Regions:
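Residue-level signature of catalytic and energy-coupling elements of molecular machines
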Residues: 13, 19, 38, 59, ...
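Conserved G1/Walker A P-loop phosphate-binding module
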Residues: 1-57, 207
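Conserved Switch II/interswitch segment of TRAFAC-class P-loop GTPases
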Residues: 61-64, 75-96, 106-125
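Conserved nucleotide-binding/hydrolysis micro-motifs of P-loop NTPases
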Residues: 63-64, 87-90, 106, 115-119, ...
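C-terminal effector modules of nucleic-acid-centric enzymes and ribosome-associated factors
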Residues: 8, 108, 119-123, 133, ...
C-alpha cells in the first residue's frame, strides 16, 4: 500500500477542516469548544483510502496562539495542503505557516484556493497568483493548484483523485525508527495506547521499543494504522501502539520512542538556524512534538552573499532531548515565529568555538570524513560510532567504512571506536608507569582496559604487542622483563593474604585488592583459589573472602554475643560487631555450621 502523510496549513477560518471533511467525511473539530468557536484547537487525524493508496491528513490549527500545536502536527508530514481563502487571500498565519513548512523541510505543496463559490473570478485569480508568487520565494515544489468549493463536488473529486494518485519518494533517514507520541489513551481491556507519526525504519508487532524520556522499554502488544490492525508499520504512517509494560504509567505525551541503545540525551544542540535571533535569546525549541525552553548562543552569523539570514547556534536546553542529525526544528520567541533550522550536532562536544564551527561546516556539507578527522584529532582517547545513526544519520557499518579511510587512525570494529595513533603511545606510557611503580605487576589486555575506560581491549593488546622488549609473557600474563614468574605468583599470594588479614572482619573485595597490586583479574582469582585450597582463606560469598583466623575471630565474637543476650540475629549482631548487614549475615551463616548452634526462626542460639 502506498502511504502519504499530508499536513494542512493556512490562516484561521480559510477552510482547512471543512476541506478535509469534504474529502473524506471526517469532522476534525470534535470538541464542543471547537464547534462553538468554529476553529481547530487541537490536532486531528484522518485518512483517505482507495485501491491501495492511503492519504493521511493532519489537520492543524491556524490561530496565531496555537503555533506550537501546528508545528507538532506538521513536523512529520511529507507534503502539505496550503489552504488559502479566495475571498481573503494570503493572511498573517498563511505566511507564517509557509515559513514553518520551509523550516520543517516540507517541500511538496498542493495549493488549495477555497470558497470559490462566493468569490469573483478576479478574487480567485488574485489569491492564486499571489500565493504562487509567495511560494516561489522559497524552495518549494508546487505539485498542483486547485480552485475549490466544498459545495462543488466536482472540484473536490478532482483534488481527491489527484491525492489518491500521488506518489512521493521517501526521503526520511531510514537508519532507525523514530516516533514522538502526540496522543495517549487508556482503553478498557487494552491498556495504554500511544499515537504518533512513524519516521525512518519500520516497526513490527511483538517487537520492543524504548521510551527514552521515561527510560521504559516496552513491547508492542498490537498496532493499528488508520484503524486497521497491522503486523508491520512503515515510515510516514500514523501508528497507534498498544504498549505492554508494567511501567507504562511513566510514559507521557511528547516522549521520544526508538530502539533501545541508539540515542543519548543532551542539554545542548549545535544547529544551523535560518531566521532572526540574538545571542542569549530565550526561546522555545519545537522539535518533534516537544516544546522545550532554551537559550540560544550564536556561534557565527551568515556568510556574505547568502540568500537567507543563517547562523550556527548552540541551544542550551532546560532538559535533555534525544535529537538526531539533520532533524528539523522551529524556534519561537514570546510565542512569535523566530525561524527554524536543522540539528547538526546532537551530541554535546567539548570543543572550542573555532573548532566547533569547523565541525558544523563539515556536518552541514555532509563531509563526514573531514568531521571524523577533526573528532579523531580532538578526542585523542577515541570517539565512538555506536550512536552514528543519531550523530551522523548513518548506520555504524557505514560509519566504519568512512573511518577506515582516516590516516593515522586505529579502528576497533568490535567496540566501534576510532582512535588516533597517539592513543596507543599513551597506553604504552601507562603500562611503563605501572611496572615502574610495582615490579610485581602482572597484566593482560583486559586488565589494562579495565583500568582505563577509554581504552578498548584491542587497543591495549596492540600496545602490549609492541612492548616485547620491555615485557615477558607466561600463562596469559605480561610482566616486567627478566622477572621470575613463579616468584611473582608467590609474592602475589602473600600480598593478597596480607590485605585480606588487614581488613579483619571487613576485608576488601577481591577486585579492589587486585588493583592494589596492579594484577590481572585472572591472576588474582588464581591466587585466591590457591589460598582457599590451602585453607588459609575461606570464601563466604561470591565477593567475600576472609582469612581462616579472622573467621574464627568472628565466630568467637558471635558466641560472646549469644552468651550475653541469649541469641544472635542480624539486628544485635550488626551493632555488636559494628559491621554492615552484608558482613553480619555472612558470619551468622558461617556460625550455622557450628554443631553447638541451632537456628530458631532468624535467631541463633546455643543448643540446650
Amino acid at each position: 500500500m502506498s502511504s502519504i502523510l499530508l499536513a494542512s496549513a493556512g490562516h484561521i477560518d480559510h477552510g482547512k477542516t471543512a476541506l478535509i471533511k469534504a474529502l473524506n467525511g471526517f469532522e476534525g473539530d470534535s470538541t464542543d469548544e471547537e464547534k462553538r468557536r468554529g476553529i481547530t484547537i487541537d490536532l486531528s487525524f484522518s485518512h483517505l483510502e482507495k485501491n491501495g493508496a492511503n492519504i493521511a491528513f493532519i489537520d492543524v490549527p491556524g490561530h496565531e496562539n496555537l503555533l506550537k500545536t501546528m508545528i507538532s502536527g506538521a513536523f512529520g508530514a511529507e507534503a502539505a495542503l496550503l489552504v488559502v481563502s479566495s475571498t481573503e487571500g494570503l493572511k498573517a498565519q498563511s505566511l507564517e505557516h509557509i515559513k514553518i513548512l520551509e523550516f520543517l523541510g516540507i517541500k511538496k505543496i498542493i495549493l488549495c484556493i477555497t470558497k470559490c463559490d462566493i468569490a469573483s473570478k478576479e478574487q480567485i485569480s488574485h489569491s492564486k497568483s499571489a500565493s504562487l508568487a509567495e511560494l516561489r520565494k522559497y524552495d518549494f515544489d508546487v505539485l498542483k493548484s486547485f480552485e475549490l468549493s466544498i459545495f462543488d463536488s466536482s472540484s473536490i473529486e478532482a483534488l481527491r483523485q489527484f491525492l489518491l494518485a500521488l506518489r512521493i519518494e521517501n526521503t526520511q533517514n531510514s537508519c532507525l525508527p523514530r516516533y514522538y507520541i502526540d496522543r495517549l489513551f487508556n482503553i478498557k481491556g487494552a491498556g495504554l495506547v500511544a499515537t504518533g507519526t512513524l519516521l525512518g525504519s519500520s516497526i513490527e508487532l511483538g517487537g520492543k521499543l524504548y521510551d527514552y524520556d521515561a527510560g521504559v522499554e516496552f513491547g508492542i502488544r498490537s498496532m493499528q494504522v488508520h484503524d486497521k490492525p497491522v503486523s508491520v508499520a512503515n515510515n510516514a504512517q500514523r501508528v497507534a501502539i498498544n504498549i505492554s509494560s508494567p511501567l507504562a504509567h511513566k510514559i507521557k505525551k511528547g516522549d521520544f520512542i526508538s530502539k533501545k541503545g541508539n540515542f543519548r540525551g543532551f542539554k545542548e544542540l549545535d544547529c544551523v538556524f535560518f531566521g532572526s535571533i540574538t545571542h542569549g535569546a530565550e526561546v522555545s525549541l519545537c522539535i518533534g512534538t516537544k516544546s522545550i525552553n532554551a537559550k540560544a548562543s550564536v556561534l557565527s552569523s551568515k556568510k556574505e552573499g547568502e540568500k537567507n539570514e543563517s547562523y550556527f547556534i548552540t541551544l542550551k536546553l532546560d532538559k535533555e532531548v534525544f535529537a538526531s542529525f539533520d532533524e528539523r526544528f522551529v524556534l519561537l520567541g514570546g510565542g512569535a515565529l523566530l525561524g527554524g533550522g536543522r540539528v547538526l550536532n546532537p551530541i554535546s562536544e567539548p570543543l572550542k568555538k573555532r573548532a566547533k564551527i569547523q565541525l558544523l561546516i563539515m556536518l552541514l556539507e555532509r563531509d563526514f570524513l573531514a568531521a571524523f578527522e577533526l573528532l579523531k584529532n580532538t578526542h585523542k582517547k577515541g570517539f565512538g560510532l555506536l550512536c552514528s545513526a543519531q550523530r551522523f544519520g548513518i548506520l555504524p557499518s557505514s560509519a566504519l567504512k568512512i573511518a577506515k579511510e582516516l590516516k593515522n587512525a586505529i579502528i576497533d570494529e568490535d567496540e566501534l571506536n576510532v582512535y588516533d595513533t597517539s592513543a596507543k603511545e599513551s597506553l604504552k606510557d601507562f603500562i611503563r608507569f605501572i611496572i615502574s611503580k610495582n615490579e610485581l605487576a602482572m597484566l593482560s589486555a583486559s586488565s589494562v582496559a579495565l583500568k582505563l575506560p577509554w581504552a578498548s581491549k584491542m587497543l591495549a593488546q596492540m600496545a602490549i604487542d609492541e612492548m616485547k622488549s620491555e615485557l615477558d609473557f607466561e600463562n596469559g600474563l605480561y610482566f616486567k622483563k627478566g622477572a621470575d614468574f613463579s616468584k611473582l605468583k608467590e609474592s602475589l599470594e602473600e600480598g593478597i593474604l596480607r590485605e585480606i588479614e588487614r581488613g579483619v572482619l571487613a576485608p576488601l573485595a577481591p577486585y579492589n585488592i587486585y588493583d592494589i597490586f596492579e594484577c590481572d583479574r585472572k591472576a588474582g582469582d588464581d591466587a585466591l583459589k590457591r589460598l582457599t585450597a590451602r585453607g588459609v582463606v575461606v570464601r563466604l560469598e561470591h565477593n567475600l573472602f576472609i582469612s581462616a583466623k579472622n573467621l574464627d575471630l568472628a565466630k568467637k565474637r558471635l558466641l560472646e554475643l549469644i552468651a550475653r543476650d541469649g541469641y544472635a540475629d542480624v539486628s544485635n549482631a550488626k551493632d555488636f560487631l559494628n559491621l554492615s548487614r552484608k558482613y553480619t549475615i555472612a558470619y551468622l551463616e558461617a556460625l550455622d555450621n557450628d554443631e553447638r548452634i541451632e537456628k530458631i526462626e532468624n535467631k541463633r542460639v546455643l543448643k540446650s
